[in-house]
Amino acid sequence: MSETSVSETAVTEKKPYQKPYTVGEEIFNSVTHGVGALLSIAGTVLVIVFAAINRGPMEVVTGSLFGASLIILYTMSTLYHALTNPTAKKVFQILDHNTIFLLIAGTYTPYTLCCIKPVWLGWTIFGCIWGAAVLGIVFSSISLEKFRKLSTFCYILMGWGIIFAIKPLKDGMPKFSLIMLVLGGVLYSLGCIFYVKKSIKYFHSIWHIFVVGGSLLHWFSVFWAIGMPVE
């Protein structure tokens, strides 16, 4: 290999990874998750207020964590797709992927600490999920491209891991809340089909729609689980 080839390769490797999105796609991506961020702020306020009125401190705290994870995810995603500076875009691309792990753990939090009994089981699942989220964030931060497929697998595995505690979860939450939880998980999972095929034009944008839909259903699930009065 010539010195010129080596030099060109080195420069190429140092360039930030750029997704092949068109301007139209990036506008759509930014708008959809910008709307998601605004809805998340409103939804978080509602969960906190109703949890404070109808339930207790634990519901308020866990609802706040769930809402914060939604707001952070949608904000990071919106900024990532809106930015044009290559260096800034690379940084927010990593943050965008890391917040997926944050959202999964944040979504688990109200269910594990407010719904699942016995209490030790809920706290155990809570610890495992947040531990897995931290590991996922570390690996994605080290090399987003190297661990991309592994990260996608972990998203799905972590998301559906709750089925191993489905009986105590079912016993500790309203039926409507459980239905919304499952349907939200289905939407997220179907969206992953478009996520892994994002090289096709507008498929990543479709993934964004599935994410908004899935998180909306999960918001209803959490709201009914910790914001409504206990029957």
Where in the sequence are the language-model features?
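Multi-pass alpha-helical transmembrane bundles in non-GPCR membrane proteins
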Residues: S2-E231
